[in-house]
């Protein structure tokens, strides 16, 4: 059964025979269709062995999202302080001036309303004119991503690991305490003690807000790092195709690897490069950037992960990550993202 046939069955057979499910019709019709399409895509990817079995989404347990699309000129109208959403009507925006308004001639094609940690967000697809001109005349750079430092650039700039900062460590300790408190409330509730359900929901919201705050700090750091790199206007940027899935199998490194958000960095860097007319090169994951001497091109096969300084028989001595960044910059075998 395809997503289209499921939608026909839902409207013509299931809802008429189940009056208690009539609330589905109260929702914006395109939002229901989009949910069915997403479910169809998820199952298709599962049967093609491209992803795991789809997770069941439920209000209160998952991040709820609502999709809307512009069917006529009166839909999806945006002003500086408010946005008109089909079915919901006018909704005030807390952060004013971020979305291009209809008065300025911009057209909103579609959007998504989502909720995270008791906060509502809207993201919109807007058609904008492409007026930017590429002026990337500087030398290309290579970026080596790692765990000790988040990113080492071949121009000498190093971006520290934000997860080692005192602020994030404090928040992670606070998160552990709140998670333990939530677990105790669930245990007491199962034993039939006097812990109220409302208190569990309050504690759950505390945990969600801490998760969201930590995630926002990491995402903000990635955005600022990419913006600073792109401002140097290199002619090209070379990164390595990291085997993150393989790195996650190491139980000693999995948490540190996940918190670095390497894939998000790559996706956002690719979008920024496309926006500014830069070429993003991706070196093969088997390219020995860390083990190759930048001076004589000799490969040290005995180099260990604990060796932070690269020493070659030719006398070349350099920081391991900086040496890898230089090799990535000069890599001749790559794919353009």
Whereabouts are the PLM-identified features?
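N-terminal cap/recognition module
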Residues: 1-5
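Positively charged, helix-rich recognition surfaces that bind polyanionic ligands
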Residues: 101-104, 116-337
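Acidic carboxylate diad motif detector
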Residues: 6-116
């Amino acid at each position: 059964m395809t997503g289209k046939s499921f939608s026909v069955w839902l409207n013509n057979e299931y809802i008429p025979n189940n009056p208690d499910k009539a609330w589905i019709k109260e929702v914006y019709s395109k939002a229901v269709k989009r949910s069915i399409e997403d479910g169809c895509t998820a199952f298709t990817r599962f049967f093609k062995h491209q992803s795991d079995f789809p997770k069941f989404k439920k209000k209160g347990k998952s991040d709820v999202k609502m999709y809307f699309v512009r069917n006529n000129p009166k839909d999806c109208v945006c002003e500086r302080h408010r946005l008109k959403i089909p079915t919901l009507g006018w909704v005030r925006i807390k952060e004013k001036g971020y979305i291009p308004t209809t008065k300025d001639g911009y057209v909103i094609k579609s959007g998504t309303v989502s909720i995270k940690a008791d906060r509502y967000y809207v993201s919109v697809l807007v058609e904008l004119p492409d007026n930017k001109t590429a002026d990337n005349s500087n030398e290309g750079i290579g970026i080596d991503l790692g765990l000790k430092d988040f990113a080492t650039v071949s121009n000498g700039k190093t971006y520290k690991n934000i997860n080692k900062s005192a602020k994030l460590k404090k928040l992670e300790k606070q998160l552990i305490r709140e998670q333990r408190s939530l677990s105790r409330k669930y245990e007491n509730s199962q034993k039939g003690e006097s812990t109220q359900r409302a208190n569990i929901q309050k504690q759950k919201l505390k945990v969600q807000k801490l998760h969201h705050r930590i995630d926002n700090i990491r995402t903000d750091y990635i955005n600022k790092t990419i913006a600073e790199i792109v401002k140097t206007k290199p002619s090209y940027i070379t990164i390595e195709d990291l085997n993150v899935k393989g790195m996650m199998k190491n139980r000693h490194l999995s948490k540190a690897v996940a918190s670095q958000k390497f894939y998000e960095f790559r996706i956002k860097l690719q979008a920024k490069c496309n926006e500014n007319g830069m070429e993003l090169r991706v070196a093969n994951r088997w390219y020995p950037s860390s083990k190759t001497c930048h001076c004589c091109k000799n490969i040290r096969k005995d180099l260990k992960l604990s060796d932070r300084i690269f020493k070659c028989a030719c006398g070349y001595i350099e920081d391991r990550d900086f040496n890898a960044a230089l090799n990535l910059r000069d890599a001749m075998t790559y794919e353009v993202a």
